[in-house]
Regions:
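Conserved catalytic-core segment of nucleotide-activated headgroup transferases in glycan assembly
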Residues: 113-116, 127-186, 196
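Short hydrophobic beta-strand element within catalytic cores of glycosyltransferases
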Residues: 234-237
Length: 334
């Protein structure tokens, strides 16, 4: 979301009393002014061009709030962040029986493993606002970032962390990391719970660690891995889902053999110059593939190609401003 709202559009973010899951708005984030909070009850008065859905239940919620049906009376896309939850290769996507709402996957792996049925699909890979080269690596510990690593233990690879302690201590970041040492039967100094930090504080802290370990078995490509790379950290990565595409040869260590990854951490701990060299290569690779400008161009291309609600109702080719590629058409309300 941090990257998405940095385009040339106006982004309408619903708010509700209590700022719950249906109405968080900006959530206190330092986003551009174009990311505008709107009370949910006022959405009917807004000239919405496109709605970006992220949960299946949002389809009915949009009808309630706008009086318009996504995909039919209101152009819509469904942004799918995740891998399938239940069946790795046979699970049908919630929109698989519809052809009026494109499904946007954030990785090619996700597009491969979801059964999307009739739904048109497109891959728009992550975009990362460049935090700048911050790596120092003077703290000889590993950085590990995951939310709720106890509940999601095997999913995020938290169960593998004890195997790395022979190479170096671990600093864990994210929501729920305070429970991690006890859950793994380890001392608090072996795995230090650093907490859920703001993005700026997180970046500054992990950039001091010697390297970053990414051990997820079955998640979509983690933004924390890409952020670590753009900060200039060398990365040690379990070769699952989209990892091999994110970390090409010569940029970091990628393997399904955990012993190989532990050996890589030992090398980085012993050779700070090599750690710095690999971190610089990781940063260059991440900015080339996951740069913000490419990400925003991809989204603009998709949004400009969406058929208008008018053309859907009338059954005629669209003349919507969404398909007018003049410079004035590059700002829309989302």
């Amino acid at each position: 979301m941090d990257a998405f709202v940095r385009g040339l559009h106006t982004y309408l973010l619903p708010t509700e009393p209590g700022r719950g899951p249906w109405g968080l708005g900006r959530g206190g984030r330092p986003w551009p002014d174009s990311a505008r909070e709107v009370p949910a009850e006022a959405l009917r008065q807004e000239p919405i061009d496109v709605v970006v859905l992220q949960r299946p239940e949002e389809i009915e919620r949009v009808v309630e709030l706008t009086g318009r049906r996504p995909g039919w009376e209101l152009p819509a896309v469904f942004l799918e962040h995740n891998t399938p939850k239940r069946e790795p290769v046979t699970e049908r996507h919630p929109l698989a029986d519809r052809d009026d709402i494109p499904v946007v996957h954030v990785t090619h792996f996700n597009d491969l493993v979801w059964d999307s049925g009739r739904a048109p699909t497109v891959v728009i890979e992550h975009g990362i606002p460049d935090p700048g080269l911050q790596y120092s690596g003077h703290v000889e510990r590993l950085a590990f970032v995951a939310n709720e690593p106890v509940r999601r233990r095997r999913i995020v690879g938290a169960d593998l962390l004890p195997r790395f302690l022979g190479a170096g201590g671990i600093d864990a970041y994210g929501m729920g990391v305070a429970e991690l040492p006890d859950a793994l039967g380890l001392r608090a100094d072996e795995i230090r719970a650093m907490g859920d930090l703001s993005p700026d504080r997180l970046h500054a802290s992990i950039a001091e660690r010697r390297c970053y370990v990414h051990l997820s078995r079955w998640t979509s490509l983690g933004l924390s891995l890409l952020e670590a790379m753009t900060l200039g950290l060398p990365v040690v990565v379990l070769d699952a889902t989209e990892a091999a595409r994110a970390v090409p040869p010569g940029v970091g260590f990628v393997s399904t053999n955990v012993d190989t990854l532990v050996a890589a951490v030992r090398l980085l701990m012993a050779d700070p110059d090599e750690a710095r060299r690999l971190g610089a290569a990781a940063r260059e690779a991440a900015l080339e593939r996951y740069g913000l400008a490419r990400f925003l161009r991809d989204w603009d291309s998709l949004l400009l190609d969406l058929p208008s609600a008018r053309s859907r109702r009338a059954g005629v080719p669209s003349t919507s401003p969404l398909e007018d590629r003049s410079s004035d058409a590059h700002r829309h309300d989302l």
